[in-house]
A protein has these predicted regions:
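A metal-dependent hydrolase metal-coordination microenvironment
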Residues: 1-106, 111-123, 129-151, 155, ...
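C-terminal functional module detector
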Residues: 1-3, 23, 160, 167-310
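Catalytic pocket-lining loop regions of alpha/beta-barrel enzymes
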Residues: 126-127, 194
Length: 310
């Protein structure tokens, strides 16, 4: 398998959603999603109704508090968040990870659930929802989340990016994206979580976009660590993937950017480019971004998790 479309933030009628679990699974299959995560707020009551024969799924929960929300993926039972405070969040995350969960920050700048925790060890975070909800020009929370992610990468954290629709109902008026996961082997919870934990993810408006790096006869993929020096980046772009999910806006795909520490662009090329040479610096991260125009306005349309150098 190679970079399959997934939705990692879904709600059923056991929580805030309007769908039954069976309806959610069928709608996911109809939407050609390879896998979803059920993440009802502070409950796992929907787990018993999951059916991987319809759509493979991850058992998860949105740990919702007055100070922000976490996504805990790969859990077997509900997590008690009643006593979670801004100052004990590190111990909560450590306990989740100790029980095998993959832990992410959900919509850190959402007006109804902004991140207010005093997290000390960001290295215990596996992923961050850099994009959330429908893609509109009014959705400024995504720009802030992307900047937060960049700051964490600059601190040396290896954190993957995800998109979260926060799927609750049949709202179809917006343009919704997906998270592409590089799932190796059978499509199931174990392999999907392995991909996310290893940082093999892409947040996208729909377009399929990823890269590999070739260095001294060895090929590296997103999420991996390699040495500094001369390298060749190979880009893979399918502009028509999930095209049915596009909205009424006019989208023009234009350029690929390679971004590194501090959000600095070290390379920009046309979207049709397949291979570029670049000299990687030590102790840096590098992510690829696909840019274009939406109704004439310049917009980021896909972003990969980084590779790292050491």
């Amino acid at each position: 398998m190679s970079y399959l479309p997934c939705e990692l933030h879904c709600h059923s009628n056991h929580g805030e959603g309007n769908f039954s679990v069976s309806e959610l699974l069928q709608k996911s299959a109809d939407d050609h999603l390879a896998l979803i995560a059920i993440t009802d707020k502070n409950t796992t009551d929907g787990f018993a109704e999951l059916d991987d024969s319809v759509t493979p799924s991850i058992k998860g929960m949105e740990c919702a508090t007055p100070y922000g929300s976490l996504l805990a993926l790969g859990i077997d039972s509900a997590v008690d968040t009643l006593n979670t405070t801004p100052d004990n969040i590190d111990s909560v995350i450590q306990e989740l990870r100790g029980n095998g969960a993959v832990v992410g920050i959900s919509h850190p700048f959402d007006e109804n659930g902004a991140w207010k925790f005093n997290l000390r060890n960001h290295r215990n975070i596996d992923f961050i929802e850099v994009w959330h909800g429908a893609f509109t020009f009014a959705n400024v929370e995504n720009d802030k989340a992307l900047a937060m992610w960049t700051e964490l990468l600059d601190k040396g954290c290896h954190i993957a990016c995800t998109y979260g629709r926060d799927w609750k109902n049949d709202e179809n008026s917006g343009h919704f994206g997906c998270t592409y996961l590089d799932i190796d082997g059978e499509i199931n919870q174990h392999n999907a979580l392995k991909a996310l934990r290893m940082g093999k993810s892409v947040a996208s408006t729909g377009v399929k976009f990823f890269f590999r790096v070739h260095q001294k006869g060895v090929t590296y993929t997103i999420g991996e660590t390699l040495k500094k020096g001369s390298s060749v980046f190979s880009f893979f772009t399918d502009l028509h993937s999930r095209e049915k999910n596009s909205g009424a806006e006019e989208v023009e795909y234009q350029t690929i950017k390679l971004i590194t520490n501090g959000g600095v662009c070290v390379m920009e090329t046309v979207v049709s480019e397949r291979h570029i040479h670049i000299n990687l610096k030590n102790n840096h991260w590098y992510r690829a971004e696909l840019w274009g125009k939406v109704d004439g306005e310049k917009k980021l349309l896909a972003v990969t998790s980084p590779i790292y150098t050491a």
